[in-house]
């Protein structure tokens, strides 16, 4: 598996023909954030590789996730009667979240500024974004947590899926239309949540216990905003863009079945993970919510990355992500009845396997495309083909 090549020769040829096409109509992005990013990008030296900026932002998101996992492992820290997350942690998380969002906004501008734009850069950016979804949602959950003043772990599980499906819809659109319509919800959510983290440090988590309108709690507003944004903005706009392309006869695929193929694995992942929760003899989501969320988010990111590769290379998306086979077997075993400790071992084993498999997939795809385009992923220096090929062989990946 060390030298396994995930990107086929057909897909590599498709990447050679790829041209970036995106539409951003979000007023916040157009009139506030882009001017801000245009100023910020000038701070970066011209020798700094865009992918290094992208990866740095991703690492900040992961750091926030780990920091909050340390102070709030089971999502009870914001509940009454429990030891709360220190105020300085909220400030750090808020600042780092906004910095990560800023880095995600300037990486493409740095690529154009240094004349180093490649399909690898876009794939690297959007691939990491797909994994960031679970880190972002789970970290935000600590603001309210579970308990009498929060939301249940199952409700958060459903909200996580709302975010995941909202993310993949944009890439499903591009798979079918050839154009990436950037979602409005991303910019709004990043700016809002960064602000809310800081406010939490100032007013304390107790401020979120109180109703802000009649008996409508802030946790209800949190839930309503996520669902409302998905149902009233993301989904309608995705369907509108799809049907516009259908009406203009510009869809890349002629079959409804083929158009829906990219959504099969994510939907199956939702069905299997939900079945596990409902059939779990030990109530696995209550026992290990953070690990379960991470397992789902990692498997989802892997399916999304496969879609992005196919979308960018104009090749057919695989119907089934094979990571779902072991998940199916685990759900089958759980349904037959197992001891609580066995189910926990299965969850941790599966999560570890998914994580290693996804990291391997990402590393191999980046190395393949780096070799194909004759570039280094984290440097603007240009290697010759012999040196790059020898380097990859020596690394043994």
From Swiss-Prot:
Looking up InterPro entries in the UniProt record yields:
CDP-OH_P_trans, CDP-OH_PTrfase_TM_dom, CDP_ALCOHOL_P_TRANSF_CS, CHOPT
Tell me which GO cellular component terms the UniProt record holds: endoplasmic reticulum membrane; Golgi apparatus
Q: State which Enzyme Commission number(s) the record gives.
A: 2.7.8.1
Q: Which residues form a coiled coil?
A: none
Q: Which UniProt keywords apply?
A: Acetylation, Disease variant, Endoplasmic reticulum, Hereditary spastic paraplegia, Lipid biosynthesis, Lipid metabolism, Magnesium, Manganese, Membrane, Metal-binding, Neurodegeneration, Phospholipid biosynthesis, Phospholipid metabolism, Selenocysteine, Transferase, Transmembrane, Transmembrane helix
Uppermost EC category:
transferase
As stated in the Swiss-Prot or TrEMBL entry, residues carrying the post-translational modification N-acetylalanine are 2
Stretches that traverse the bilayer: 47-69, 84-103, 123-145, 150-172, 179-201, 221-243, 256-278, 291-310, 317-339, 344-366
Q: Does the keyword Lipid biosynthesis apply?
A: yes
Membrane topology note: Multi-pass membrane protein
What does the record give as cofactor?
Mg(2+); Mn(2+)
Listed under GO biological process in this entry are:
ether lipid biosynthetic process; myelination; phosphatidylethanolamine biosynthetic process
Molecular functions per Gene Ontology: ethanolaminephosphotransferase activity; metal ion binding
The subcellular localization recorded is: Endoplasmic reticulum membrane
Tissues expressing the protein: Widely expressed. Abundant in brain, placenta, liver and pancreas, followed by heart, skeletal muscle, lung and kidney. In brain it is strongly expressed in cerebellum, followed by the occipital pole and the frontal lobe.
Q: Which reaction does it catalyse?
A: CDP-ethanolamine + a 1,2-diacyl-sn-glycerol = a 1,2-diacyl-sn-glycero-3-phosphoethanolamine + CMP + H(+); 1-O-alkyl-2-acyl-sn-glycerol + CDP-ethanolamine = a 1-O-alkyl-2-acyl-sn-glycero-3-phosphoethanolamine + CMP + H(+)
Is Transcription regulation included in the keywords of this UniProt record? no
Predominant location: endoplasmic reticulum
Pathway the protein takes part in:
Phospholipid metabolism; phosphatidylethanolamine biosynthesis; phosphatidylethanolamine from ethanolamine: step 3/3
Q: Which disease is it linked to?
A: Spastic paraplegia 81, autosomal recessive: A form of spastic paraplegia, a neurodegenerative disorder characterized by a slow, gradual, progressive weakness and spasticity of the lower limbs. Rate of progression and the severity of symptoms are quite variable. Initial symptoms may include difficulty with balance, weakness and stiffness in the legs, muscle spasms, and dragging the toes when walking. In some forms of the disorder, bladder symptoms (such as incontinence) may appear, or the weakness and stiffness may spread to other parts of the body.
Report the sequence similarity comment from the record: Belongs to the CDP-alcohol phosphatidyltransferase class-I family.
Q: What is this protein called?
A: Ethanolaminephosphotransferase 1
From which organism does this entry originate?
A: Homo sapiens (Human)
Classification from the root reads: Eukaryota, Metazoa, Chordata, Craniata, Vertebrata
